[in-house]
A protein has these predicted regions:
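C-terminal boundary motif of the adenylate-forming
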Residues: 194, 199, 233-259
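Conserved ANL (AMP-binding/adenylate-forming) active-site segment centered on the GW(Y/F)…HTG consensus within
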Residues: 73, 142, 169-192, 227, ...
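Conserved C-terminal "lid"/linker of ANL adenylate-forming enzymes
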Residues: 213, 238-240, 247, 288-353
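Conserved adenylate-forming
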Residues: 3-159, 163, 167, 184, ...
């Protein structure tokens, strides 16, 4: 039996109703489930127990990634108190978890492994019918989309683009010869994705080629890994890295207003609208702190110098996200062009002699 949930908001109840054995979703769904688990663990002693359980999972991660079930007393207790409850929220009977549609953040995959869940990330496009590579129960490596399928050839172009060749690759676009010519070169399909292949043949996908940010200093930044790390914060709904042809990168954040409003009430911050809330200096300081933590793990040219909070949620309905929950970057940047220009102008003025 196959079941499809068209609305992400209804996913929790759909999982309980269907009780699937195999679960396929885009990374945004796994982010949502992670965020709900973090929210439910708030307060003492819940958070202390939760953090302890995660530390137990971290120690047993090699076994989990090898497809084994840990047998230590600590693992059994952590599983009973925490991990089993997270899995119960996903139906309780899922044996196989698959992610596709966009790169899955490494930190997120690591967290799921800590609670006993291996997410098998795969990669493919419509033009490749569709799967190119996938992690399997036997060959599995976090941070990659696995090894390529039989009879599929993959190589990395000089500019980092993933090229694919094989019998499953399409012949061309119907009645669109110019687009076909641009997409195919000597039998190789240009995926439009940036990636690499490690020494063991595992393929990693970094970002969309068109989404790479080139600063005015000539440095290239892949936004998705940074955005994925930011979205692990319970206070962030969606993050969009800015900085193309600018002097430095910045980030536009659409908050998770459920958790932000709870935090504001707990900290006695009065507000009558979301616009007033995101303009509050204490709220800005909260997000500055989140970004500062992320910056510690970034190269100097990648560090985010400014944080821009918006009062709007980024959704499929308002055109900010695709049906697979990817950012529509050009639409978002166009919609907030004035605010973005003002952000950089203020930064220029602040650093002027």
């Amino acid at each position: 039996t196959l079941a499809y949930c068209p609305f992400i908001e209804r996913l929790p109840e759909a999982l309980l109703e269907v009780n699937p054995s195999l679960f396929v979703a885009v990374p945004r769904v796994y982010e949502k489930i992670y965020g709900q688990a973090i929210q439910k663990s708030k307060g003492f002693p819940k958070r202390a127990i939760f953090n302890w359980a995660i530390s137990v999972g971290e120690r047993h991660k090699p076994e989990i990634l090898a497809g084994k079930t840990p047998t230590s007393t600590a693992w059994k207790l952590a599983n009973k108190l925490v991990f089993s409850k997270v899995r119960a929220g996903m139906g309780g009977q899922v044996e196989t978890f698959i992610s596709g549609g966009a790169p899955l953040g490494r930190e997120l995959a690591e967290w799921y492994a800590n609670i006993g869940i291996r997410i098998h990330e795969g990669y493919g496009l419509t033009e490749t019918s569709p799967v190119i590579a996938v992690n399997t129960p036997i060959n599995h490596r976090i941070g990659t989309v696995g090894r390529t399928l039989p009879n599929i050839d993959v190589r990395i172009a000089e500019d980092g683009e993933i090229l694919v060749r094989g019998p499953s690759v399409f012949k061309g676009y119907w009645n669109r010869p110019e687009e076909t010519k641009a997409a195919l070169e000597n039998g190789w399909f240009k995926t439009g994705d940036i990636g690499n292949i490690d020494a063991d043949g595992y393929l990693s996908v970094t970002d969309r080629k068109k989404d790479l940010i080139k600063t005015s200093g000539g440095k290239f930044i892949a936004p998705q890994p940074i955005e994925n790390a930011l979205k692990l914060s319970p206070y962030i709904g969606v993050a969009a890295i800015l900085g193309d042809r600018r002097k430095f990168p910045a980030v536009m954040i659409s908050p998770n207003f459920v958790t932000l409003e709870e935090w504001a009430r707990a900290n006695n911050i009065a507000f009558t609208s979301r616009a007033e809330l995101v303009a509050n200096p204490k709220v800005q300081s909260l997000y500055d702190g989140v970004v500062e933590e992320i910056n510690r793990n970034l190269a100097r040219f990648e560090k985010l110098k400014r944080v821009m909070l918006v009062e709007d949620e980024f959704t499929i309905a308002n055109g900010a996200l695709t049906p697979t929950m990817k950012l529509r970057r050009r639409i978002i940047e166009g919609r907030y062009k004035k605010q973005i220009d003002d952000l950089y102008a203020q930064a220029e003025a602040a650093t002027a002699p």
